[in-house]
Regions:
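Conserved catalytic scaffold of divalent metal-dependent phosphoesterases
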Residues: 11-13, 28-30, 51-52, 83-131
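Generic detector of short, locally flexible boundary/turn motifs and exposed helical patches
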Residues: 40-46, 69-70, 80-87, 116-119
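Active-site neighborhood of phospho(di)ester-bond hydrolases with catalytic His/Asp-centered motifs
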Residues: 21-24, 44-49, 74-81, 102-106
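Short, well-ordered coil/turn elements that cap or connect secondary structure elements
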Residues: 4, 15, 39, 70-72, ...
Length: 131
């Protein structure tokens, strides 16, 4: 079940109000339901685990989310452990690369004066190959 929560962050460093939608642990969930909760945001942040590492069954939902999310707002994706542990990650990554999402894998970007970054989950998991 998806739910919408609101957290307000204030800082003298933030010069304009921004609304971020954060999604994590989607695990092949319903793309349309998730995106309906995100309409009107300034950016979508994906914290990983769009897929379930044990099943290719829901990849279609993850691909739909990745293709539709950038139409709602600029989208930034940090791969989670479920993506990293996919036995066939080489087949999943092209789905990600075909979308207009920005992958944040041990890198940072500036978005309207806010630094967004992603840390590779592979760094914490010995033996994980870099993507």
């Amino acid at each position: 079940m998806m739910q919408k929560n609101t957290i307000t962050v204030t800082s003298d460093k933030i010069t304009q109000p921004l609304t971020f939608a954060f999604a994590a642990d989607f695990h092949n969930g319903d793309a349309d339901e998730a995106l309906s909760l995100m309409r009107g945001c300034d950016a979508i942040l994906i914290g990983g685990d769009l897929v379930n590492r044990h099943s290719r069954h829901g990849w279609r939902n993850a691909a739909r989310f990745l293709n539709l999310a950038p139409r709602v707002a600029p989208t930034f994706y940090n791969l989670g452990n479920h993506e990293r542990l996919l036995p066939d990650i080489a087949e999943y990554l092209p789905l990600v690369q075909k979308s207009d999402v920005t992958v944040l894998d041990d890198c940072f970007v500036d978005f309207r004066g806010i630094t967004l970054g992603g840390v590779s989950s592979a760094r914490k998991m010995p033996g994980m190959p870099p993507v």
